[in-house]
Amino acid sequence: MDKNIIIGAMTALITPFKNGKVDEQSYARLIKRQIENGIDAVVPAGTTGESATLTHEEHRTCIEIAVEICKGTKVKVLAGAGSNATHEAVDLAKFAKEHGADGILSVAPYYNKPTQQGLYEHYKAIAQSVDTPVLLYNVPGRTGCEISTDTIIKLFRDCENIYGVKEASGNIDKCVDLLAHEPRMMLISGEDAINYPILSNGGKGVISVTSNLLPDMISALTHFALDENYKEAKKINDELYNINKILFCESNPIPIKTAMYIAGLIESLEFRLPLCSPSKENFAKIEEVMKKYKIKGF
């Protein structure tokens, strides 16, 4: 298997709700907008998609919709399929593969605090259950669990279909260290604030929250960097500074969904508890920053 298979500009899709249910029509439109604006892959049912509060049926439906909309296009589907129960992560990975997803994004197990050996066995079981590409997802600020550099490298070398890691630890030194020890690995930025530093230090793509709103700019930034045109990439990165900052003024995905609502890209500003709408102050701040950007709606 070619380990370079899912890289480039990728969007961590929000999940729009309406009257307490997944708004499937808006969801489909959002994916089509991504396709039309140069995104290389979409990631349904991940952190930004509020996977923790989706039912199992809703989670699977989000994957199915993404696969159906992307069918026949160049845009790939990297399905969110993580769990802190290995058997459930395996079941999700199998479902995603059987229903046409191009790859799997699997977050580190949260809450139960596995050892590094436990993490290794968890991911090995997932990788052995499917023959599609698997991207590890390291986000210790949310999971309370750090996948060590040694564990990431061992999994990459031992499991043919584990092709890299989405790094959302905010630790640039770790990212540089990973590539120094295993330059074949596909390092993917998982934080919009450090997309440019990661791409300019050997990263091969981004999984972006901001690209829900500005897919064309994130695509351009990513591809300029991959083409080693760092001057143009940095120029776009600088233009995105204020929006990247405000989109994390509260817990993701609260600000990005708010911005999408303000832009008229989703019909209803709904969250699943314990997530809730932003404060009035932050709503106003998001609205003010957005005035500086030209958002292309439906």
Swiss-Prot record:
The keyword Amino-acid biosynthesis applies. It comes from the Bacteria. GO terms for cellular component: cytosol. GO terms for molecular function: 4-hydroxy-tetrahydrodipicolinate synthase activity. Signal peptide: none annotated. Pyruvate binds at T48, I207. It holds the Pfam family DHDPS. Its EC number is 4.3.3.7. It is an enzyme of class 4 (lyase). It is found in: Cytoplasm. The record marks T47, Y111 as: Part of a proton relay during catalysis. CDD domains: DHDPS. Pathway: Amino-acid biosynthesis; L-lysine biosynthesis via DAP pathway; (S)-tetrahydrodipicolinate from L-aspartate: step 3/4. It catalyses: L-aspartate 4-semialdehyde + pyruvate = (2S,4S)-4-hydroxy-2,3,4,5-tetrahydrodipicolinate + H2O + H(+). Keywords: Amino-acid biosynthesis, Cytoplasm, Diaminopimelate biosynthesis, Lyase, Lysine biosynthesis, Schiff base. GO terms for biological process: diaminopimelate biosynthetic process; lysine biosynthetic process via diaminopimelate. The active site is at Y137, K166. PANTHER family: 4-HYDROXY-2-OXOGLUTARATE ALDOLASE, MITOCHONDRIAL, DIHYDRODIPICOLINATE SYNTHASE. Belongs to the DapA family. Homotetramer; dimer of dimers. Catalyzes the condensation of (S)-aspartate-beta-semialdehyde [(S)-ASA] and pyruvate to 4-hydroxy-tetrahydrodipicolinate (HTPA). This is 4-hydroxy-tetrahydrodipicolinate synthase. It comes from Campylobacter jejuni subsp. doylei (strain ATCC BAA-1458 / RM4099 / 269.97).
